[in-house]
């Protein structure tokens, strides 16, 4: 028996020359929707065919698109987008097909907006308010929801004809979280868009979230029971990156030194970094884990594996709080970002369309014939990328999810292994 489709197209409307043109499921060849925690805009690729009036030949870009679909559980997805490219267009008689490459309308506005002005006048302004009120709502005039987490530090700077998203990425490395972290909270924010809107939040803040979904490798739903919407059944995981040691040595992730020269007062300072001191103090997704043995080789007095020099001019941003330690903040935020993406895992499944980039999941996987918990790869992860794809030939939507974790060691258990035996939940 053919499995039930988990994709139902509710609406697909493209504005062409001021008129709305509706497309049905019969016109849809493929659809790919992408969210990325490193990107300020969602993307969608829509491949269409038209055998009636060849309307696709009239597309030239900048057409508004509204799409709405749901899965077999009634979970709804809808988005307003803008066409910025048409690829693979084929015209043959009355038939036409092509792929509409779409993004958020704000991304188009961002590319056409370049601003030179001072932000945070009068002694500085908290960075979260600059991002939300001055840039996203003020410059872009976005209608999207904005989750801008509070920052501890105020800031003032001059934008040298930057686009709005460039400004936000510039400010992200200088932002220190106000709440939700610890006294050792690190500077460094992530800025991204998901289906719910814009997000500007500290890397540390992800550690405060509880997991929303359980990704279990080899899971089979018990017979005659209603499916648990929190559980995502996964056949296998692909460990893409697992803390490249050689790269870590080259970029100074374990032991490094930064030497700075400030044009403002000709001041010279050195900042030392050691993974032992930093790793123990920074909030992490999996809390205290058993670190790999090679970490012992990078003790406090180890010679730096990378020495970096930097010339700065703090006269450009002397207003606000915490600006006197700006160079230290920049170095710290860079290291926090690298730690955040320390390990990369990919999974694929068919089903729930609700997971969003930035949400927390718990991954449980097993090893060996005895199906013991794989402590090296199980644990808490953040969803870093989502790629959903519908193909008309199989009438199914699959989801590829990229997960990241900042924990370099082994976990002791997951909620699933505490609540159930491996024999009860896996094949």
Q: How should each PLM-predicted stretch be described?
A:
Residues 1-32, 76-77, 420-425:
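Polar/acidic, low-complexity leader/linker segments enriched in S/T/G and N/D
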Residues 10, 42, 63, 77-79, ...:
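Envelope-exposed proteins and targeting segments
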Residues 11-15, 63-72, 358-371:
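Short conserved beta-strand and strand-loop elements enriched in small hydrophobics
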Residues 25-26, 70-102, 365, 369-401:
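Short beta-strand and beta-hairpin "edge-sheet" elements
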Residues 33-58, 221-427:
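An acidic/polar, Gly/Ser/Thr-rich interaction patch typically located in mid-to-C-terminal regions
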Residues 49-51, 70-72, 82-90, 103-108, ...:
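Solvent-exposed coil/turn segments that connect beta secondary-structure elements
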Residues 53-145, 156-157, 172, 176:
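Surface-exposed cap/loop segments at beta↔alpha junctions
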Residues 97, 147-247:
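Short beta-strand-centered interaction patches in the first periplasmic/extracellular domains
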């Amino acid at each position: 028996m053919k499995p039930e489709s988990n994709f139902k197209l509710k609406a697909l409307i493209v504005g062409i020359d001021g008129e709305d043109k509706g497309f049905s499921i019969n016109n849809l060849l493929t659809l790919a929707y992408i969210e990325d925690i490193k990107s300020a805009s969602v993307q969608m690729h829509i491949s269409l065919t038209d055998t009636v009036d060849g309307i696709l030949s009239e597309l030239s870009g900048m057409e508004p698109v509204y799409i709405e679909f749901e899965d077999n559980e009634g979970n709804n997805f809808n988005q307003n987008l803008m066409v910025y490219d048409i690829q693979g267009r084929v015209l043959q008689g009355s038939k036409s097909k092509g792929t509409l490459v779409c993004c958020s309308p704000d991304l188009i506005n961002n590319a056409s907006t370049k601003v030179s002005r001072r932000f945070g006048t009068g002694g500085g302004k908290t960075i979260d308010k600059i991002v939300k009120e001055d840039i996203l709502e003020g410059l872009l005039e976005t209608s999207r929801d904005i989750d801008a987490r509070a920052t501890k530090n105020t800031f003032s700077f001059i934008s040298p004809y930057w686009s709005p998203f460039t400004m936000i990425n510039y400010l992200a490395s200088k932002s220190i979280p106000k709440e939700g972290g610890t006294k050792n909270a690190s500077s460094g924010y992530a800025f991204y868009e998901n289906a719910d809107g814009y997000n500007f939040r500290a890397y540390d803040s992800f550690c405060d979230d509880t997991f929303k979904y359980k990704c279990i490798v080899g899971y089979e739903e018990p017979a005659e029971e209603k499916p648990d919407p929190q559980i995502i059944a996964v056949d296998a995981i692909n460990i893409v990156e697992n803390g490249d040691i050689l790269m870590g040595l080259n970029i100074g992730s374990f032991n490094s030194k930064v030497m700075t020269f400030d044009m403002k007062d000709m001041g010279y300072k050195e900042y030392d970094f050691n993974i032992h001191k930093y790793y123990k103090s920074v909030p992490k997704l999996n809390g205290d884990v058993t670190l790999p043995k090679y970490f012992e080789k990078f003790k406090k007095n180890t010679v730096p594996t990378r020495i970096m020099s930097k010339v700065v001019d703090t006269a450009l941003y002397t207003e606000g709080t915490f600006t006197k330690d700006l160079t230290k903040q920049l170095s710290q935020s860079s290291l926090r970002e690298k730690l955040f993406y320390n390990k990369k895992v990919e999974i694929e499944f068919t089903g729930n369309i609700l997971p969003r980039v930035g949400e927390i999941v718990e991954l449980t996987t097993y090893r060996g014939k005895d199906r013991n918990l794989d402590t090296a790869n199980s644990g808490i992860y953040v969803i870093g990328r989502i790629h959903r794809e519908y193909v008309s030939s199989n009438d199914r939507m699959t989801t590829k999810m990229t997960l990241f974790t900042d924990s370099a060691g082994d976990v002791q258990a997951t909620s699933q292994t505490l609540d159930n035996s491996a024999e009860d939940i896996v094949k």
